[in-house]
Amino acid sequence: MGIEVGKRRLVYTTSRNNDRNLDFLKRRRIEDSSSSSDHEDNQRGSLSSSSSSEEDSDRDDSHVSLRQSVDDRDLEITKKREEILDTSEIKPIERQKKSYDDEQGDVDQICKWFMDRYKFPKILYASELLEKATPLLPIVRDMYRGLVDSHYKFEANEMRQSSQRAILSVQEFRNMDLTKFTAGYYGMKRQFQIGEVILQKYKSFLLRRQGDTMKWWGVSDFAHYVLAPEVLVSLCIKEMQLSDDVYDKNARERAYDIFVNTVKFGTLVADQSPLEPWEVTP
């Protein structure tokens, strides 16, 4: 029931209705309060998430901005100006150094192994070598007098007989196993020093006594690869005290065996050792 005033309708309610309305309002306030609290929590969570996202975004933006602020061309120019090597340029150098270190380590191990096994005398400088070997050079003549059976001369003759040519060709020389003509632990460098001295002292003597084998080899190569090792066999007998007599057949056989088994030391250790004292690095 009610009275209409203009367009507004006035409603008169009873006390019972008022009580119901009051209860309804209380419930609404409680619900509103709870809803408001949840809304504030959600809002705070949203704000926190938004803030975190903004911070992440800021960090990402700053990160991207930092990365994009350096031009690749500027880096290349700086590298060239400062002569800086990049990683791709450094790695090969590191590998090369490592490879060299490994190789040097192998040489040291080889040297120690042979020294422990054979008790070699010290590696001689050229002047020391010539001083010790010069008194032994007459064995070159004695080889042609039948006083010495030459192991290396026999090998040289075998090589000549297996060839189809009148003289040693370049290709045959390249294919030759020169370890058969290497004076073991003395190495090829010191062997050639002896070969040069032999040519200086005995070249005319050798030219007068050229047989088929020496002609096939040539006098120079014959002196370096056949005669020089025989002189060093005599020196080995002296230095390693295999016998008091360098013409002792058994002692020479022992020296030949030592040479055959120590070529690796000669090529990797002795040939890397300086011939002159001034070549030694401090």
From Swiss-Prot:
Where does this protein chiefly localize?
Answer: cytoplasm
Question: Where do Basic and acidic residues bias regions lie?
Answer: 22-43, 60-70
Keyword Cytoplasm listed? The answer is yes
> Highest taxon of the source?
Eukaryota
Q: Where in the cell is it found?
A: Cytoplasm; Nucleus
Q: Where is this region: Disordered?
A: 22-70
Instruction: Please name the InterPro entries in this protein's record.
Output: RTC4, RTC4_C
The protein's UniProt keywords, in alphabetical order, are: Cytoplasm, Nucleus
Tell me which Pfam families the record gives. Answer: RTC4
Q: Which GO terms describe its cellular component?
A: cytoplasm; nucleus
Q: What does this protein do?
A: May be involved in a process influencing telomere capping.
Q: PANTHER family recorded for this chain?
A: RESTRICTION OF TELOMERE CAPPING PROTEIN 4
Q: Which family does it belong to?
A: Belongs to the RTC4 family.
For this entry, the protein name equals Restriction of telomere capping protein 4
Native organism is: Zygosaccharomyces rouxii (strain ATCC 2623 / CBS 732 / NBRC 1130 / NCYC 568 / NRRL Y-229)
